[in-house]
Amino acid sequence: MKIAIYGRPVNNNQLSLTESLIKHLTDTGCSIRIHSPYKKFLTDNLKKEFNTGSFDSYEDIKSGTDFLFSIGGDGTLLDTVFLVKDSNIPVVGINAGRLGFLSSISKENLEIALSSLAKGHYSLDARTLLRLEANHPIFEGENIALNEFTLHKKETSSMITIHTYLNGEDRKSVV
């Protein structure tokens, strides 16, 4: 299997979990690539080099990746939207925190989950990928989200117009 690993390079609590994951995947013959900032974080904090590849963007993993592992919480998993976009790469959420709704594999169940994954005993939850377009350049990067967007008006007395489309079909316009 070809695995990509993503995590936020800020949480020392997940170092041993990530190290165990990499060891398990390597021992089972998986090809691994780690998101570059996270790989640097791991190397700096564990004082250890990892014999894995790295990646920086969607372009690096969009083809030839079987799964992307997200290590952290739900926020970390939501970050992966910008990495997988419309590639249909399944995201496996490993919860390194206290509570996870999207990242549902706990540290305690990691080995069981990895074994099931290797045997093909898993199911996929379909998620909705949304794209937001605006008349003004309001995005610094990607204009996509998983499941929902939150809109805030800059001026409370101004009106906004929202056009909603589903698969290119006008659903309803709201003023």
Annotate each PLM feature.
Residues T26, V84-S87:
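Short, conserved loop/helix-junction motifs that constitute active-site signature segments
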